[in-house]
C-alpha cells in the first residue's frame, strides 16, 4: 500500500500523470519513443493517439482487464504484449525479461511508440523499462533507475524486482575489462 503523507510534490505529480516519455523517438535512427505509465493511460484513447502509441506492454496481474481488441475496435490499432505478474517482492521477473525487452526493442526499431504500463506506473512497469535500458543501452542498474526517476519521479521497483534487475545487470553488463564494444544500442537516453 502506498502512503501519500509526506510525499514530495514531484512524486505526487508523477503519480497523477498517466504516462511519461522515457526515451524520445530518433529521426536519425527512425526509432519510436518509449513511455512509462499507469493503467489510467490506456483508458484515455485521446492520450494514446496524441502520443502515437502503437504498442503496449501490460505488466499486470489483472484477469479482469479489458482486451486490447476492444481498443482496436474503436479504430486504434495497438499491438499488445502481456506480462502477468504480481507486484510482490517474491515474484520472479527474470524469466520474462529477455523476451519482453526484445519485444519492446523490436517495436521501437520499427518506429513504433511503446507504452509500458502497470497499475500505477511505479514498480512493475518501471522494472521492465529499467531492464530494457540495461539490456539495450549497456546502463548499470543505478544509472537506469536514475534516468527513469528523472522522467517519472514516483518510480520505485519493489525489493524483489530490484534484486532481479541487479542480477539482470550482472548477466548483460559484464565487468568493464570484459565488455565487448558497443552492442544493441539504438538511441541515446537524454
Where do the model's predicted regions map?
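Glycine-rich, flexible N-terminal cofactor/catalytic loop recognition
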Residues: 21-70
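Beta-strand cores of modular interaction/reader domains in eukaryotic scaffold and signaling proteins
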Residues: 35-37, 55-58, 79-84, 115-117, ...
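PTP/DSP superfamily signal
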Residues: 1-15, 32, 98-114, 120-122, ...
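Intrinsically disordered, low-complexity regulatory regions enriched in Ser/Pro/Gly/Thr
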Residues: 27-30, 47-52, 72-77, 107-110, ...
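Short coil/turn segments at secondary-structure boundaries
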Residues: 48-51, 68-72, 95, 128-129, ...
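Short polar/charged helix/loop
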Residues: 42, 61-67, 74-110, 135
